[in-house]
Amino acid sequence: MQSDPNSYDYWPYVDRPKIVWPGGKKLAFWLAPNIEVYEYDPPSNPGRPGWPRPSPDVVGYSQRDWGNRIGHWRLMELLDRFALRGSVSLSTAVIDHYPEIVEACVERQWEFFSHGIYNTRYLYGMDAAQERAVIEDSIRSVQNATGQRIRGYLAPALTHTENTLELIAEYDFWYTCDLFQDDQPQPLKARRGKLISMPYSLEVNDVITYGALGMTPARYADVLKRQFDQLLREGETSGTVMCIPLHAYLVAQPHRLRMFSDALAHICAHAQDVWFATAAEIAAFYREVWWDAALADIEARGLATGGTSFAPAKSF
């Protein structure tokens, strides 16, 4: 039995070293469009069914396929209007199934980070070698298709395992979105490299707000504005991060898009205080400027709960 994952130290939000983002900004804002492929009849997994309904589930499949056929383009057009880039949580199968989407993202200089191969192929039950193969596929596939070396990770369908952090650190990933413990980046206790947890969000993730909680579009927009306003206020003390995880099959429905646009307009109206960035840009800046100060503060306050010996990450 294990009481906690021992992936990071308890580090109270108060009295940390003050983070200042580039240009003196108070809040780092990033968008995470999840561009995924769901299989009509996926392979079975002992830890989780592929679909909540009996498989094959044409309803669930076709709704998500709508997201890639229609919703993505509608969402991309909206983000273009606000001159916002996405950091794409990518199922690498998108490269084969929907290459036009990948090309459009590259054209706009969007970031890609790993979200597995298919979002219906879970990591539960995999050994380290099998999970390593998924990670290597992500690195290789995105590099070949886009020229980008991916630096971030979100386990497919959030099926993080006990091996995930050490594996992605071994391959010189900079950040993971699998942890939800903070509103600022935090160093993680991996044996290699400088891996951080990147604030993602379940609270404002459209899968939760629309799929689980059944919020109205107006309510969701209000939640986004409140989330932003609070984090911006706290950014006066020390820089915060706000991420909006998105799924086009949800947020880009015709009756929902205008209210999401209203929320983005509210956020963009505070441009003087906001760093609009990709997740990789946030991670790179934090690792270079704030990593050492964070570790020193954790150590000085007697909060470290286990030694972290960092070694060079594996090149790929």
What are these language model-derived features?
Residues 185, 197-219, 239:
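Positively charged, amphipathic and often flexible ligand-engagement surfaces
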